[in-house]
């Protein structure tokens, strides 16, 4: 609050009031603030990230480690109070506050979406993301947008208008005598960009929109300090006095608070948005997660080398070879080694050139511009995908450099603090030049993570002191000693820091090698071990202190300390990381939920049991399926270094480091042997307990990120396939415009028909012109009905088809598209084709019109979108779907770009099953790259974008532009009569800066023919081509030279003539022209000249692949998408549709004899179904027409139909294991059966099936993973069978009907839970688990011990009722009340008497012998005599043990006794009460039991666990220890 007060005082000090008018305290406060402003503050550049360790982890780690922490707590409280006393004396900047928060473990809680790296207790979490620059960047992405949005309603705003204008209203409303409130009014919209109010009116559709309503009258500066206001009153003598009074602080509601932020964002009204729109820099450069920054030549050289290594050469942990092909450098693949290095140098040079184009501010070119207009500079070595990869990795390089500079600066400052301060603690581990160089030359975030982790361990506790030392040094205040005292105790209450504070580090230094020396010995033995002359425990004795109370604790602390330091050494981490990743394996096992959930349709069905699979064998996105299943609780995932064979041979990771004897002294003395053992424990602790868990989590995150990247790449590839083809281009001829009312020659007319999934809804057709605007539409109610359907369906279908014919005859489309909704589309396509053919046969249309099946997904997304509803509010959904489908057939790019809107409808496209499981920002990045490529390749008609809303979104993907610049540009166009006559007007009229214009000019095309019709101004013909304005003169020169006319000729006329006769360009020597340009200093421009020549031949020729209707496998995938996926080996439910027959030749039929059945009837030998009493009837049947009841032929199988409309064939041999002549003897028509898919033929849309029980039971073993865990699978199978059997038995057991308060139909487990909540005197009677003619009685003896016995029933009237006679042992009872009163309650009473006895052992059972004996000894020390102790038996309920010392040797004897309904049985004697048993025991305890007299061999004691199977020891068994 002091900081806020100080700022408020500054504001007030500049408000124009004199010092005399201020209160005295206020003047003193301002003077003090001015003094503080004179001091120089040092900015801490420490990491602005949260510290990963938390206090809870440290407390757990500290448990049992130190002797007493009371003093430490008191110190901590003292520190806290000391800190609060000085909190207002120093003003820290944000980074200093972040740094202190980091080291005090004060941080905001973040939602963790990733596996946390659990090794470190003091590393910063974001920087520890291993090998995931992508993910790290995602987490760092500028919160630019978010911050700008947060700034929407806040921030100080300057004055608005003059002072006199502001006081005008006060003057008018003044009533003379009333006090005047003379308060400055700060308008909330003072700093709003010009035109923001108009934009807001457009967005919200409110003509009288007033931005004043968005902001409070009183801004933050207005009285922030003391919340006062000035009131001017008459002093009675003609003068005025000013009175300061507390102002009304009641917060006023604003219009801003009632509007969703997203609604304001739609218009890009924020100041930050306007700044992006106006700045002369590509918008994507400004919005990049790490913005593009200026770089010098040395940095670009280093970056180019780094990019070729990590972007194009560095491999992945998992197998991503197939997906990485698009990003590989084709120019150096499969080259001969003799030329490889030279080509690689050329590629590095090209990459550096690309970086110069991106990062040198005088260029600022986007990758697309470089690919099209700077081909020669990159020697045509880099593809467009390569350029984008360079751009993306430039972002990672900038992010890495930013992190690196922060850590380097922090280490440099710490070293300065070590060298110049008087803090001896800081000098213990000086930072060397090598440490700084390691940081400076770190190449990956992993390396930086390791360096930072080591720094945080060694110097993290010194950061507070360093900051205060820096401030004290620069301000000249002598407060350093005070700071040192105040921060003497560590604020980091973790195990390592406790060791440091108590001097344990000195003992760790006597182990022979420091952690740094150990890491340097990994490659070769550079350092010899310095052997300490004392034994380890003897040396530890010297460091015993209150916190470490004995030598064992000291030695353990030293081992932990050195192990921690070893685990943080970057070289050690690098070594372990490489080893771990090379050999890591993983195991997959389904959970109980997974076993029930994962069926044959699940992608992990054949991968759900995995054993010891190498991580490197994972492919593409495979691991993301495992991760998703793990998150859903379906499987358990375990990653380990050792394979199953390694575990069997004890070949663990740590052994690789121990076997090299890095930390071993080669001597055989007792001292050396003990020290070697201690050193091995250190290494084992560092590797096994600290690094392996860390590396396991790090590897998990790494392969998870690789899987997510694979999904993103597959989404990009799928999306590219949808926009890489052009729309339908008809072959125009002279008959195309022979009808009145048709558009001009060459204009396309596209029709689309969409039918709904609900058959009772109407279908719609729509026709669009070449601009995608609706020309006409058609409603067909009965389009989906069948032509030969029953009832009136045929007539209704004909009505709809007649409407379709009339529409086509009138509008004459060039092509018709039909949506692929389900399998019905193939039938409906035939209907449309027949209708078109009928029109053509009647000469009603001049040529056949093609009908195409089309992917319907994008059209359905558009149909459901808010944009669709806003643009076509009066059209039904199916018509809107047809409109989108027609535009997709016209040109897919504008329609897909149309989905990239504020609602992000583009993400509704189904591109990959796992696309929802990756970060949407990552998905947006790869999809935007593809749209930028294709939009710029096709070119953007800017006037069409201004005229038609469905084209508008294309403009944002133009090179150099973005959503903000595109919006701003369109507003400028609308202000200029909605027309751009030339590219030059983008600069003159729309005020585009030179850099943005250079990027976008070549990709913005002007339809010169249409523009010429609308304006009399000069229209540059080259503006309609891909020729960039910077090379217009070369194009004109080429046209003049090709025509061989004088240079003084009109170049525009020459261009026109060349475009009409492009063949004349063939004779032009472009190579010579290129050489001339090179001599004139323009550089190599041969590729550019050839591109210009191509454009003059055909302006903006579509470079995409021509439109192609989906067929074969692609069509099958689109059709199968409408239902449940069917794959080979799957079991699917299908309905028998018909029997399939094979025709029999008539000549062969004459020679076939009918079969004679047992009933004497004759049966057809072919169809096996027709019978007749005479052979002639069979002959007539065989020769008859099958459509009129004749023989259909020999049945060969059945035709099956599935829910998704597909059909399959199951031959006779696959219907049953036995021979089948007639399928109808095994199956019935229209009945559902399960079938197994043996073969899937996507080209023919056919399935080859089997319904044999043997096939249905077997899994397709060929589909199983190579590392399938058969042993675990069989074990789980047996477990599932056992559980199923128990469940079946439970369901079949008769439910008992017994009216008694103690009876419950529950299991033993449920009964024990109920008894835990009941009184000790209660018991539960329940059905017996083994027999229906029996009951079980259960009661609780003590914690974990329950007695249970069987009651036999006889004389039962019903199986579910209770028997009239109950028997336990040899005793009979008439009913349950008698059983409880005579048998159960006496034993409960005696057991309660024992368990409440003062000498009863309550903390365990008698099987826990050591605990019982310890309790006996404690009682002896407490009572001063030999006691006896009771304990209950866990193994044998209803039996107890009495433990006692029977002689002076303090040996303890344990004897069992048993409670019975009539008392207690002990040493083969019965006693009525416990007191009588104890009286007898006290007289005879010194006598050995009978069993010990017979045998001197002590008996074994029971332990808590499973009940013993054999032998059975009698209740009176005794033994002693």
Curated annotation (Swiss-Prot):
GO cellular component, one term: transcription elongation factor complex
Keyword Transcription: yes
Motif (Nuclear localization signal): 26-42
Residue span(s) of domain S1 motif: 1183-1252
Compositionally biased residues, Basic residues: 26-41
Residues forming coiled coils: none
UniProt-listed Pfam families: HHH_7 (PF14635), HHH_9 (PF17674), HTH_44 (PF14641), S1 (PF00575), SH2_2 (PF14633), SPT6_acidic (PF14632), Tex_central_region (PF22706), YqgF (PF14639)
Ranges annotated as biased composition (Basic and acidic residues): 77-89, 126-157
CDD domains reported for this sequence: SH2_Cterm_SPT6_like, SH2_Nterm_SPT6_like
Comp. bias (Acidic residues): 45-56, 67-76, 90-99, 166-176, 191-200, 209-238
Hydrolase among keywords: no
Matches recorded under InterPro entries: HHH_9 (IPR041692), NA-bd_OB-fold (IPR012340), RNaseH-like_sf (IPR012337), RuvA_2-like (IPR010994), S1_domain (IPR003029), SH2 (IPR000980), SH2_dom_sf (IPR036860), Spt6_acidic_N_dom (IPR028083)
Gene3D superfamilies from the UniProt entry: Nucleic acid-binding proteins, RuvA domain 2-like, SH2 domain, Spt6, Death-like domain, Spt6, helix-hairpin-helix domain, Tex N-terminal region-like, YqgF/RNase H-like domain
Domain annotation SH2: ranges: 1300-1389
GO biological process: nucleosome organization; transcription elongation by RNA polymerase II; transcription elongation-coupled chromatin remodeling
UniProt keyword annotations, A-Z: Nucleus, Transcription
Protein role: Histone H3-H4 chaperone that plays a role in maintenance of chromatin structure during RNA polymerase II transcription elongation. Required for several aspects of morphogenesis of C.elegans, including regulation of division in the germline and gut and specification of ventral-uterine precursor cell fate.
Record-given protein name: Suppressor of Ty 6 homolog
